[in-house]
C-alpha cells in the first residue's frame, strides 16, 4: 500500500470512520451505542468504516445495521482475525499490511472520524490524523465522543499546549468534542461547509508529495 493520503476535494459526508479501544465499557452500553450510531447515521444515509479493535462492538454495529440501509465495513490490521470472531454477522473485512497502512486506508476512504474512548493505540490514531490535518494532508473533521467526560482531561492538556505556544489555536480547534453522535454530525456538516468554501483557494499536498518550497517531502513510513 502506498504511503499517501488523497488530496482534498469538495465533498459531503458519505462514510464516517469510527475509532476506539478494544476494552468493553459494558455490554448494554456498547449495544446501545452501536444502535445509536446506526440510527443517527442512517438518517443521513452515511455508511460506517469501523477502524477500532473491539470486534465485539463491530458485531453490535453489524447487527444494528442489518435492518437499516447503513453499510458497515471493518478495516482490520491483524490478519489472524476471522469472521467467526464477530459472530454470525457479515460485513466486508479488510486487512492491511500494518497499523500505519490501515490508518492511511481509513483516511482515504472516509469523510469524517468519530473517536470513542481508548488507550495508547487510540491516542496514537487521534494524534496521527490530527497532525496530518494540521499539515493540510487532509481536511476531514475529527470528533471525540466524550462519553463520561473521558476526553475532558485530554482537552485540558491540549489547551495547556496552546498556552505554552506548542500548539496553535487553529490546530487545537481541529479536534471537535461533544457528547452525542447527533451533535457531532451537526459539527461535521458545519466543518465541511467551511472547507468547501476554502477548497478553491487552498489545495493541500498529498503525504509524500514534493512541495514548492525547498524542503524534503515528509516520510510517514514506519
Q: Predicted segment positions?
A:
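Proline-rich low-complexity regions
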Residues: 77-80, 117, 141
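Active-site/ligand-binding-proximal alpha/beta "capping" segment
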Residues: 100-136, 143, 194-203
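Hydrophobic "lid"/C-terminal helical patch
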Residues: 188
Amino acid at each position: 500500500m502506498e504511503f499517501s493520503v488523497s488530496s482534498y476535494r469538495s465533498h459531503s459526508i458519505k462514510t464516517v470512520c469510527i475509532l476506539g479501544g478494544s476494552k468493553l465499557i459494558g455490554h448494554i452500553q456498547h449495544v446501545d451505542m452501536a444502535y445509536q450510531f446506526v440510527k443517527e447515521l442512517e438518517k443521513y444515509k452515511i455508511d460506517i468504516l469501523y477502524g477500532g479493535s473491539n470486534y465485539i462492538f463491530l458485531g453490535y454495529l453489524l447487527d444494528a445495521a442489518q435492518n437499516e440501509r447503513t453499510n458497515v465495513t471493518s478495516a482490520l490490521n491483524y490478519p489472524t482475525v476471522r469472521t467467526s470472531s464477530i459472530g454470525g454477522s457479515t460485513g466486508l473485512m479488510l486487512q492491511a499490511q500494518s497499523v500505519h497502512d490501515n490508518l492511511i486506508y481509513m483516511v482515504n476512504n472516509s469523510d469524517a472520524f468519530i473517536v470513542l474512548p481508548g488507550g495508547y493505540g487510540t491516542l496514537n490514531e487521534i494524534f496521527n490524523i490530527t497532525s496530518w490535518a494540521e499539515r493540510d494532508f487532509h481536511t476531514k473533521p475529527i470528533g471525540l465522543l466524550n462519553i463520561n467526560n473521558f476526553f475532558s482531561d485530554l482537552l485540558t492538556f491540549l489547551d495547556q499546549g496552546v498556552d505554552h505556544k506548542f500548539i496553535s489555536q487553529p490546530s487545537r480547534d481541529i479536534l471537535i468534542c461533544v457528547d452525542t453522535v447527533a451533535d457531532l454530525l451537526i459539527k461535521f456538516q458545519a466543518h465541511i461547509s467551511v472547507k468547501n468554501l476554502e477548497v478553491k483557494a487552498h489545495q493541500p499536498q498529498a503525504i509524500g508529495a514534493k512541495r514548492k518550497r525547498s524542503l524534503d517531502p515528509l516520510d510517514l513510513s514506519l
